[in-house]
A protein has these predicted regions:
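Catalytic alpha/beta core domains of metabolic enzymes, predominantly
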Residues: 21-46, 53-200
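Active-site entrance/lid segments in N-terminal catalytic domains of soluble metabolic enzymes
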Residues: 1-31
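Conserved phosphate-chemistry cores used by DNA topoisomerases
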Residues: 1, 197-198, 208-216
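Short acidic, S/G/P-rich loop/turn micro-motifs used as interaction or catalytic elements
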Residues: 8-17, 84-85, 180-186, 211-214
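Terminal-region recognition feature
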Residues: 179-181, 206-209, 219-220, 236
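C-terminal helical cap(s) of enzyme catalytic domains, especially alpha/beta-barrels
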Residues: 89-104, 193-194, 213-237
Length: 237
């Protein structure tokens, strides 16, 4: 049996109701919570492991989560890539626009976006724009969207595969979660042929809609050649 255990971050029994009421935003920033709240999921995962259960330790969005997650000895760790890549692309676009124009309206848009995506809390509506710029810059730099490592949104996957290779958890696998979009599977497919990861293909699991995975059996020129074949079979020369 594999039991799914989520990271809880700053969410606890006292504030979880905030996610269900009003604007559904949390009043605590993701990085300003209590240690006991951050490690709630880790403790649960370890207890389950001690009782003989396998754990799928989920809600892993950033590479920095992986080292601590592996200490819980999970059967699965995760890389959430789809929404993360979209968010990174949007932040990078607004930050680039600000850096070219120094128009604070771009930072104001970033601030609203970061509140909506929980980089900032619901109480940060008037957060200093210099803080907003710093958070945006650090996010873009860490996720390496302007570099070969992360231009495809796969920086977290690369990191997690390296962590698995260098761990002593031979049974642990990486789930790449909820991929979709015209480039996500093709980019992951190319990543798995990179020489660095040729020994890790049996450590990765993909989760997605069957219809999305199935569409990657097709290509535009299949139609082109089927047209030729069918018309040739119909007697056309």
């Amino acid at each position: 049996m594999v039991i799914k255990v989520p990271h809880t971050g700053p969410v606890n029994g006292g504030n979880v109701g905030e996610l269900l009421e009003g604007n559904k935003r949390l009043s605590t920033r993701w990085n300003q919570a209590a240690t006991s709240d951050y490690l709630h999921g880790h403790n649960l995962a370890l207890k389950l492991k001690e009782h003989g259960f396998r754990v799928n330790y989920t809600l892993m969005f950033e590479p920095w989560q992986t080292g601590m997650a592996l200490q819980a000895k999970p059967y699965f760790i995760n890389s959430f890539v789809r929404q993360r890549f979209g968010v990174t692309t949007y932040i990078n676009g607004l930050l680039t626009a600000y850096q070219k124009t120094y128009d604070d309206r771009f930072l104001e848009d970033l601030r609203s976006f970061m509140i909506n995506w929980d980089f900032l809390s619901k109480n940060d509506q008037d957060a200093d724009l210099r803080l907003v710029e710093r958070v945006a810059r650090e996010t873009v730099e860490y996720r390496k969207i302007n570099e070969k490592e992360g231009f495809d949104g796969m920086d977290g996957v690369r990191h997690n595969l390296r962590m698995l290779r260098n761990s002593n958890l031979d049974d642990t696998r990486l789930i790449v979660c909820s991929i979709e979009g015209s480039r996500m599977y093709p980019e992951l497919d190319k990543l798995m042929t990179e020489p660095e990861f040729k020994d890790m293909t049996d450590r990765i699991v993909i989760t997605t809609e069957p219809s999305y995975l199935a569409q990657n059996t097709s290509a535009p020129q299949i139609i082109t050649y089927q047209r030729r074949f069918m018309n040739a079979a119909n007697g056309e020369k």
